[in-house]
């Protein structure tokens, strides 16, 4: 089963690494890595996989590589 998960990523955050669920069920991922050379994207994917209790190989960034709003494909 494949799902698309939309998340807001906050790179360079002192609050991270953390996954927060907002009142509207939106996921916000705080990562310490800066948005340089895809490091924040990779950190967000790792953190999302851990939050969903899945291996990292089952989480793939499909949209939003240069945006804070990202879409990940999740294989369950």
Curated annotation (Swiss-Prot):
<dbReference type="InterPro" id="IPR003746">
    <property type="entry name" value="DUF167"/>
</dbReference>
<dbReference type="InterPro" id="IPR036591">
    <property type="entry name" value="YggU-like_sf"/>
</dbReference>
<protein>
    <recommendedName>
        <fullName>UPF0235 protein MMAR_2910</fullName>
    </recommendedName>
</protein>
<comment type="similarity">
    <text>Belongs to the UPF0235 family.</text>
</comment>
<dbReference type="Pfam" id="PF02594">
    <property type="entry name" value="DUF167"/>
</dbReference>
């Amino acid at each position: 089963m494949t799902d698309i998960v939309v998340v807001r990523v906050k790179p360079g955050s002192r609050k991270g690494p953390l996954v927060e669920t907002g009142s509207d069920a939106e996921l916000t991922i705080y990562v310490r890595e800066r948005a340089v050379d895809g490091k924040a994207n990779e950190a967000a994917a790792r953190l999302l996989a851990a939050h969903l209790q899945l291996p990292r190989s089952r989480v793939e960034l499909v949209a939003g590589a240069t945006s804070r709003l990202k879409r990940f494909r999740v294989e369950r």
